[in-house]
Amino acid sequence: CGFGGMERFTEAPTDFSPIDLYPDCKSVIAVGIALPKGLLRVEPRLLYGHFNEDVVHKVDEIVFSAAKIIEKEYDGICVPIPSDCPYEYWETETMTGKGLLSMKHVAVACGIGQIGKSSLLLNPEYGNRLTLGAILTNVDFESDPVCKNICIPECTKCLDSCPVLAIQD
């Protein structure tokens, strides 16, 4: 979990700023649950898919419950943001869509991790295994420190292991 004030979102991608969704937003809370390492080390990926779906629902339950607690305890207004859906649009053919926020950018702004060369969110403890959700609120919480970049400049592990060579240095 991490907290980020709106000053951290001045360079949010176009149409992905928290204030685009909730103009009175003063703070964003990012929540992440890590999948076990082993799920990324087995084939087929059916196990990963099964448990990732479960974790998505758990993250949604956490942000929903936490939003209600914050509204009660801090007399605030909260907008829980789900981990996966909904999308503004979804292109079935290309398997691409536009969500409500960039959860990776939210997590960076809230101090949970940094975006690596692979364009994945990297957390110092959990690597790229976090499933993320968020809460937008009008309560002005103190921001957590920004996470240090954990990418080793000379490292090319993600570039070398990309099966379609999509990652450029």
Feature map (PLM): residue ranges:
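Catalytic cores of enzyme domains
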Residues: 12, 48-49, 54-169
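Non-catalytic, usually N-terminal nucleic-acid engagement modules in DNA/RNA processing proteins
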Residues: 1-57
